[in-house]
Amino acid sequence: MDSTIFEIIIDEFDANCSLLDAFQDSFLHSESSSFFGFEGPYCSATIDQIGTCWPRSLAGELVERPCPDSFNGIRYNTTRNVYRECFENGTWASWMNYSQCVPILDNKRKYALHYKIALIINYLGHCISILALVIAFLLFLCLRSIRCLRNIIHWNLITTFILRNIMWFLLQMIDHNIHESNEVWCRCITTIYNYFVVTNFFWMFVEGCYLHTAIVMTYSTDKLRKWVFLFIGWCIPSPIIVTWAICKLFYENEQCWIGKEPGKYIDYIYQGRVILVLLINFVFLFNIVRILMTKLRASTTSETIQYRKAVKATLVLLPLLGITYMLFFVNPGEDDVSQIVFIYFNSFLQSFQGFFVSVFYCFLNGEVRSAARKRWHRWQDHHSLRVRVARAMSIPTSPTRISFHSIKQTAAV
């Protein structure tokens, strides 16, 4: 249809551009537009080269219209407006003020600095966490005297954090070209990483089960079987990830299986189980704090001290049970402040959680500190004894003989 004839129809039957706003016809994107003159002090309805419909307007008005939804494949912020003047002689100004129409792409560029800072936080947090986690792992490995079921569960949780963080670093090293080529080894790394993510959350679930059983159900922990918790933590995630990998292979086999396509929910095969674990742990936390408050009220301590102890216990349990992930599980909003808070909070939480678990459940653990202190004193005593023996042996009583009597006296000290 000729552009001029189309504008005549628009001016006659859709002078307010209501139909065009509703249907967004393809006629809006005509490359040329001419003005059809009507007698009278008003400007006729017309369409500009961008595709914006300008309604019939009185002469002398400055008319505003919403910015186009998209142009040349770039989406724009439609909450802002474009302006055009209707002259006194009833003709439109040839220049339209599109300066307020900001591409949505600029919003992404606006967050570029925040994403870079968040990436630095991620690398720093994962490095600090791995260092703390490895130290905690070695302490649990060397201190055999504290190997009760509770500490064995802590040990396994710390192990999953170490493996998860190592796989995270491997994922960051994958080149973009390899990511696009969808190499087999790249998909294997993604699969292993997701397995350790799921095992990490399932060991948080094991922590919740143990605490809930011991505190709420008042069940003797001596009757709990270690192999049951090992099966839950390491074995149950396996079929979940295998199912996810098979579905990825047949239905979404691209980009190293990282991310997901719109409208496809394959990742929820394992993410759904993670969400379920977090919800159950939230119930565990609620019951544990409830029982704790009941016991504190029964004690003779003041109310302020009771609440302080309850808050302290809750804060300590949050990273152990993974409840902190639920604080910003989804983006709280699309405004700038919400986006920035979401970016930084998740970067800090995901990278430093291993560090906090190491601090709360190893470095500040009374049993671990006591056992480590005894082990240190024992090593110091043994070392000082060896030094004294070495000194005694280095001072002979004659050119050919060593006084073993002095060594015996030194060893008896």
UniProtKB/Swiss-Prot annotation:
Cellular localisation: Cell membrane
Name of the molecule in the record: Corticotropin-releasing factor receptor 2
Bilayer topology: Multi-pass membrane protein
Intervals, Cytoplasmic compartment: 142-148, 217-223, 294-304, 367-413
Origin species: Xenopus laevis
Key words of the record: Cell membrane, Disulfide bond, G-protein coupled receptor, Glycoprotein, Membrane, Receptor, Signal, Transducer, Transmembrane, Transmembrane helix
GO CC, any one term: plasma membrane
Residues passing through the membrane, by range: 111-141, 149-173, 188-216, 224-251, 268-293, 305-329, 337-366
Major subcellular site: membrane
GO biological process: adenylate cyclase-modulating G protein-coupled receptor signaling pathway; cell surface receptor signaling pathway; long-term synaptic potentiation
Domain of life: Eukaryota
